[in-house]
Amino acid sequence: MSFTTTFAVPLECESCCDSVKQALANVQGIESVDCKLVDQLISVTGTSAPSQIVKAVQNIGKDAIVRGTGQPNSAAVCILESHAPEDQAQPIKGLARIVSVSKTLALIDITLNGLPKGTYYPSIRTSGDISDAPQSLGGVYQALGSVEVNESDSASGLFSGQAFVKSETQISSLIGRGMAVSTSPDVVKPHALVGVIARSAGVWENDKTVCSCSGKTVWEERKDVQSKGLEGQL
């Protein structure tokens, strides 16, 4: 089933809109693209993973930040962090975006980066307690298959990967639960990535470009989180 996602994109003229539409023309699953030049926003309807749309826009030298997905109260997000001592400088290693497309079906867009090459196994946990994660996250609420991390990030020797997973569940049953990403399908290892699922904005619920709390633009805030490891995932 289709859903709509809005993205903030720096647009200078109608030619920029045309370039973005052309870049997205070959992304599988896109049904329509609407470009709002004055608002510096594009909205994309279809079944494509938001992370794939961001990647396609970045491939033409522009940038894109997800501003909303799905209908009100139908979207959630989970930032996945490493608590390993060696990752203290850049703890953020992944992001999961969740959008409900029906009362019983949600799509989960999982992106991982800055990791050793290999297969990783994400799962939703019964608890959202990360005080002693991953042990405090409890047992498996829902396994989410696997993510192949095999795309070279940079000269760092680390890799990234992405998966788009269907989940027969409701967003309301996921809010507040934890997520874990482990290198084992059966055991959540001590240095697994962890995070807590929280509600996120639906389409057009967050079209502002300046944060009222910090006074920073969305692009300045993006740089802040990228310095902590969240590369190309917002």
Swiss-Prot record:
Cofactor note: Binds 2 copper ions per subunit.
Coiled coil (UniProt feature): none
InterPro entries to which the protein is assigned, alphabetical: HMA_dom, HMA_dom_sf, SOD-like_Cu/Zn_dom_sf
GO molecular function, one term: superoxide dismutase copper chaperone activity
Domain of life per record: Eukaryota
SUPFAM superfamilies given in the database record: Cu,Zn superoxide dismutase-like, HMA, heavy metal-associated domain
Subcellular location: Cytoplasm
Domain HMA stretches: 2-65
Gene3D superfamilies: 3.30.70.100, Superoxide dismutase, copper/zinc binding domain
Cofactor requirement: Cu(2+)
Entry GO terms, CC: cytoplasm; cytosol; mitochondrial inner membrane; nucleus; protein folding chaperone complex; superoxide dismutase complex
Keywords, ordered alphabetically: Chaperone, Copper, Cytoplasm, Disulfide bond, Metal-binding
Main location, first listed in the record: cytoplasm
Residues the entry annotates as binding Cu cation 1: 13, 16
Positions contributing to Cu cation 2 binding: 211, 213
One GO process term, biological-process aspect: copper ion transport
Protein task: Copper chaperone for superoxide dismutase 1 (SOD1). Binds copper ions and delivers them specifically to SOD1.
Family: Belongs to the CCS1 family.
Name assigned to this protein: Superoxide dismutase 1 copper chaperone
Organism: Yarrowia lipolytica (strain CLIB 122 / E 150) (Yeast)
